[in-house]
């Protein structure tokens, strides 16, 4: 067997399995780990179905989600793969972004074709910005008629096109996860073919450090004789000393300034980058000019907005959420990055109310502007208690 060498430098990609219940998402996840373990034993451990299916519960912003994380490598890449046992877990994960996906494997049983949850997952993938999809047409061993397989493939492609994925062009690979898991050579090869399609069709994600600089402000203080310092964790990009930045959000006007010093653990740095907790010394800025909740950005890269559309998951009573539904004109706080801003909710036409445990689309109008882009995550809070989570799907103004 060809030996692939373990390289720390291999590109890292986050993927996950999505699709209707009982179409074989977890079986496929287990089959991928087995087949890759057999092909490259030095690189991969096989994960059994039971290990993946008994996913531990995680709490993300107070929301309980069962997510199984497995990792494996192909010859060219290192993958972190998420699989959720329950349908509700998928929805929560996709909306809250507990496990971000650079691409997804949509599992559709050839015996059933696309089903309601297939649709719901594809719609969510579109809304929450899962950028690429590869299709695994599973249980293909159970369909003898080639024409039926072709029809199901066509149906899946049409569904994907309907939600603005390139349905005509993306790969659809016929697999049998169960047969591959049982050690069948031919079906094992089908899973390797699927991973080759994933390698080739889910592009390398842009690294956080390569994106435009952004840091949410967590704290502001004055250092006598030096000026105003803001602290926070750099969300993305790189900042060098003496670069110009904009401070946006909360206030109506943006402020432009120069960063004259960058500190981490009381040491002066030439630059700060994504993931680091730093203090930034700002030229000519008074302490009252800036506040927690604003963001410091590469000039012009992000703008503040007050009205947006979102997809949100509302916590159930058991998760510590509301005990009662809410209606149009509901006014909670929306917690973006480091601060709460009150907003008014407009529900979609035909939605009378939203029950705890539901997921819903909504339009929100904030009382103060927040620096935002599509895909930005938020929590919905009432008096500091989280009652929901969501993400911005479209900016209106």
Swiss-Prot record:
Q: Which domain of life is it from?
A: Bacteria
A Pfam entry, by short name = GTP_EFTU_D3
The residues covered by the tr-type G domain are 10-206
Q: Which residues does the annotated region (G5) include?
A: 176-178
Name the cystine pairs: none
- The annotated region (G4) lies at 138-141
Alphabetically ordered keywords of this record: Cytoplasm, Elongation factor, GTP-binding, Hydrolase, Magnesium, Metal-binding, Nucleotide-binding, Protein biosynthesis
Quote the InterPro entries the UniProt record gives. Answer: EF-Tu_GTP-bd (IPR041709), EF-Tu_GTPase (IPR050055), EFTu-like_2 (IPR004161), EFTU_2 (IPR033720), G_TR_CS (IPR031157), P-loop_NTPase (IPR027417), Small_GTP-bd (IPR005225), T_Tr_GTP-bd_dom (IPR000795)
Q: What is its EC number?
A: 3.6.5.3
Q: GO CC annotations?
A: cytosol
Supply the SUPFAM superfamilies for this chain. EF-Tu/eEF-1alpha/eIF2-gamma C-terminal domain, P-loop containing nucleoside triphosphate hydrolases, Translation proteins
The region called G1 is annotated at 19-26
Q: Where is this region: G2?
A: 62-66
Q: What class of enzyme is it?
A: hydrolase
Q: Which reaction does it catalyse?
A: GTP + H2O = GDP + phosphate + H(+)
Residues annotated to bind GTP: 19-26, 83-87, 138-141
Q: Where does Mg(2+) bind?
A: 26
Functional summary from the UniProt entry: GTP hydrolase that promotes the GTP-dependent binding of aminoacyl-tRNA to the A-site of ribosomes during protein biosynthesis.
Describe its partners and assembly state.
Answer: Monomer.
Which NCBIfam families would you find in this protein's record?
EF-Tu, PRK00049.1, PRK12735.1, PRK12736.1, small_GTP
What family is this protein classified in? Answer: Belongs to the TRAFAC class translation factor GTPase superfamily. Classic translation factor GTPase family. EF-Tu/EF-1A subfamily.
* Protein's name in the database: Elongation factor Tu 1
Annotated source species:
Streptomyces avermitilis (strain ATCC 31267 / DSM 46492 / JCM 5070 / NBRC 14893 / NCIMB 12804 / NRRL 8165 / MA-4680)
Question: Mind giving the lineage of the organism this protein is from?
Answer: Bacteria, Bacillati, Actinomycetota, Actinomycetes, Kitasatosporales
